[in-house]
């Protein structure tokens, strides 16, 4: 009888830990989403910044890195890794969708913003 109670308690304890981990993961996802949106908003606000704005200049340099040759190299490596995984039969479609979506967002975000916004001013920040 004592062994049965210990096993039952251990299962309850494991279930409680799993629920806490799920709650922790959800809170991290929400935090990551909020921070990502905040960074994107700050970056796009800095696109039309003046020359004397040091924060805007730093964000423009960051955008140039993320849209320049470094980003193109990382995208090529990501596609090569997906190709190798496909040839080995180990491709997970979730990973492939995340990589392809990230590449599309990275390189097409300014076009999407220009399409949605009615502002015709072209920014001097970023790589075209």
Swiss-Prot record:
Q: Where in the cell is it found?
A: Cell membrane
Q: What is its main location?
A: membrane
Membrane-topology annotation of the record: Multi-pass membrane protein
**InterPro entries hit by this protein:** TrbC/VirB2
Give me the segments passing through the membrane: 30-50, 65-85, 93-113
- An annotated GO cellular component: plasma membrane
Protein name per UniProt = Uncharacterized protein RP192
Source species of the chain: Rickettsia prowazekii (strain Madrid E)
